[in-house]
Amino acid sequence: MTSSKNPTNDNSYFDAVLVGGGIMSSTLALLISEVLPDIKFLIIEKLNAPGSESTGAFNNAGTGHAANCELNYTPLDEKGNLKIDKALSINRSFETSMSLWASLYEAGKIDIKKFLKFIPHISFVSGQDNISFLKKRFQKMTENPEFIDMEFSTSFDEISSWAPLITKDRNPSTQIAATRIGRGTDINFEALTKEYLSLVSLNKNVEIRYKTELIDLMKIDKKQWELEISSEGRKTSIRTGYVFLGAGGKTINYLQKSKIPEAKSYGGFPVSGKWLICEKKDLTEKHNSKVYGKADIGSPPMSVPHLDTRWIDNKKLLLYGPFAGFTTKFLKQSSYFDLFSSIKKNNIFSMLDVGFKNNDLINYLISQSLKSHNSRVENLKNMMPSANPSDWYLKNAGQRVQIIKKTEGGGSLKFGTEIVNSSDGSLSALLGASPGASTAVSIMVEVLEKSVLFLNDKHNLKKKINDLIYPERTASQKNSTFIKEIKKRNNSIFGFHP
């Protein structure tokens, strides 16, 4: 599909329109620009800069989710068996992202120093039951090449050498354990988004409009959508053959406006967040890792505590949290009516059902919102016993909108991400949250392959994507040898030496 197939050949028509200026839309834009450089497409973003909402450095967890240390990705089933399928899938998806970055960096198209730093990922637990779980996890995961470099320790001194703030002022007789993977990362997805869009903007067929909001969209015939957009109070209409909705929490509202049948069963459950942040150099210099703990039994996935080394605006910080909370807004810079406007006659019963089933979760989120500063620091002390309230301040994190989906039993609350596609491939929407940004490349490859943009030349275009991400290799051959080769190649390009 090329811009020469523009049915109207005017400035109001685009082959594709991407709604949202965050990591998802920018990743898709990058892929389109690289493998379909001749198509004419538009990116619209409500705010005045890219990556300012969910992708923002303080709004995104930024871990470089590779399932190295996130214990909620390796749950126990009813029989006590450890399930690592999700961890393997996330790790492979993250390596796909790493592979694309390596290819672009090697070609001189992006600067990895602006968004990527290598830093160890650590899982930390205390108590015999949790230690047994962590050891079982270590044994199971190191059977796979993705996690072969993981270390396990119950030595107080060794764990102190890995993360000294975790053991400072902790009783040495306490039963503790940790795993460590040296090849962890800290990713600034806001900076990465800007790198992507800077590259994409070099393509003369691409237009990026900031301070531009989607108001409404409607399918006007079998091949076209009409979008009403507003820019600084001025409303205009544009047409396109393909729409991608990647506007974070607001995507659910836009998806509902599309009126595609596939949208009818969805709703959204908004969750806010807050960080404790430390800038004191004598502390930031002592902690050089991302440390994940284990959530309390029965608590939701967003309650998993982690103490992260982060680099934001060229400054090294410590972030602890995020502390979840409840709000009716779908974005930080949007309306408190977002949740209410998303309630429709075809999802109201599933949303009410989720509310009744998850009353404990709602109470938990409200209680988290009401915590005092000292109470939050007490939580931090479980991981960092020497924490002093005066060293930390509170900052709002981003909004997440978890997926509510209609089921035979009423409604189900889903944690994760999900792609919604129209049956004809003319519209795609991304819903959900974690692991999100870290797996953006794999997700956007899937979006692109199912879109009308790939309709006429799918085989050739899939090969182009493969060659972009995995030069001289075939992604379909993802065996242990392939995984080892790709990691070795990426390490070499990035200059990482295990």
From Swiss-Prot:
UniProt entry keywords in alphabetical sequence: FAD, Flavoprotein, Oxidoreductase, Tricarboxylic acid cycle
Assigned EC number: 1.1.5.4
An MF annotation (GO) of this entry: L-malate dehydrogenase (quinone) activity
InterPro entries in alphabetical order: FAD/NAD-bd_sf (IPR036188), MQO (IPR006231)
Keyword hit for Flavoprotein: yes
BP-aspect Gene Ontology terms: tricarboxylic acid cycle
HAMAP family on file: MQO
Protein name in the entry: Probable malate:quinone oxidoreductase
Record organism: Prochlorococcus marinus (strain MIT 9215)
